[in-house]
Amino acid sequence: MRIVHYLNQFFGGIGGEEHAGVRPEVRPGPVGPGMALKAALGDAGEIVATVICGDSWFNENLEEAKATVLALIRQQNPDLVVAGPAFNAGRYGMACGAVAEVVSKELGIPVVTGMFLENPGVEVYRRYAWVVETGNSAASMRTAIPAMAALIRRLAAGQEPEPGTYLERGLRVNTFAAERGSARAVEMLVRKLKGEPYTTEYPMPSFDRVPPNPPVKDLSKAKIALVTSGGIVPKGNPDHIESSSASKYGKYYLGDLDDLTAETHQTAHGGYDPTYANADADRVLPVDVMRELEREGVIGKLHDYWYATVGNGTSVANARAYAREIAEDLKKYEVDAVILTSTUGTCTRCGATMVKEIERAGIPVVHVCTVVPISLTVGANRIVPAVAIPHPLGNPALPPDEERTLRRRLVMKALQALTTPVDGQTVFE
């Protein structure tokens, strides 16, 4: 069996966040974790090539990335594609899932990957791949690789993977049963009435959606708050918010601040290249433009505090808990609406989860993020696409005046979203 392995820039040996923007390339044979996979597979398959792409480049150029990676994979004439494992890395998981989608649709061959259950790539792309459940981090590589290899061996032998060795794909298939449906239904009902254990044949999906709140009626009188999962904190990170899997959030006083500088603010986030945010934190938390709009009377007031956590790897449960507490505080201050910004993949999942909880509390909120598919999957209602993962509201390649103009345009789009009635999820392009 000919196998092509897809990896990101880190596991492909190119480098960390500073190389997350590299374009796709192909290398012969196994690379990085592919060496362990080769050993685990034995003679069941041969990794003929490895395709490597930077996480940020893939997610910021999704359609081009899928087409380019597909072309590189097609050249190798594989029988199967392996992606990852991605563990709980959100951008990596989304890239692995997108590769699975395009390969399964265009080449019609199986794709095997590995992800943590809360990786957003699972929910978005599970139907296109056999997804082996992994731990939260690469520390579980030792168990992930053998599990993926075992599943690949079954596919190579023309066998269906055993139930329980992969995450449910959400696909319905026809099967033959010994008893007709009416008899099985009555038996299940009797068990349920007696309080006995029973197993449904078709678990209903759970959709956690929050109806969008009415829009802000008059921006010129509205108090707007800034919230971020992008980790923007005062210099020195006084609350010691962790760079990954944050166990807390911070509430910080803006006072009369009208700009976030390299001397006063930084990011605590470990999920994206911090260079651009540390140079100008307004690229993640747009205080400068919001102050400008406040002075011009476009908004009534910028809330005196901002709220920040690190969304990188942060659990859904913690994101919900932080947002509920933040929402209660916002209500106490009579905040009318919220702009929430996010950066990387799991950060976007965290941010969108927080958006839903703030919305659930009755406050209209807009999510400004780059990885829009994650925000849509989680359930944010008002979404504004951002510039790039490490600088969602800026572009360091532009002169300062032009960059500020770009940021103002994005913030105005976010304010437009807050004043627009919506009856469901809406992306404001």
Swiss-Prot record:
Disulfides per UniProt: none
Acetylation as UniProt keyword: no
Active site (UniProt): 344
The reaction(s) this protein catalyses: acetyl phosphate + [thioredoxin]-disulfide + NH4(+) + H2O = [thioredoxin]-dithiol + glycine + phosphate + H(+)
Gene Ontology CC annotations of this record: glycine reductase complex
UniProtKB keywords: Oxidoreductase, Selenocysteine
Function: In the first step of glycine reductase, the substrate is bound to component PB via a Schiff base intermediate. Then the PB-activated substrate is nucleophilically attacked by the selenol anion of component PA to transform it to a carboxymethylated selenoether and the respective amine. By action of component PC, acetyl phosphate is formed, leaving component PA in its oxidized state. Finally component PA becomes reduced by the thioredoxin system to start a new catalytic cycle of reductive deamination.
Record's subunit section: Heterohexamer of two alpha, two beta and two gamma subunits. Component of the glycine reductase complex, together with components A and C. PB is substrate specific.
Family membership noted in the UniProt record: Belongs to the GrdB/GrdF/GrdH family.
Protein name: Glycine reductase complex component B subunit gamma
Taxonomic classification: Bacteria, Bacillati, Bacillota, Clostridia, Eubacteriales
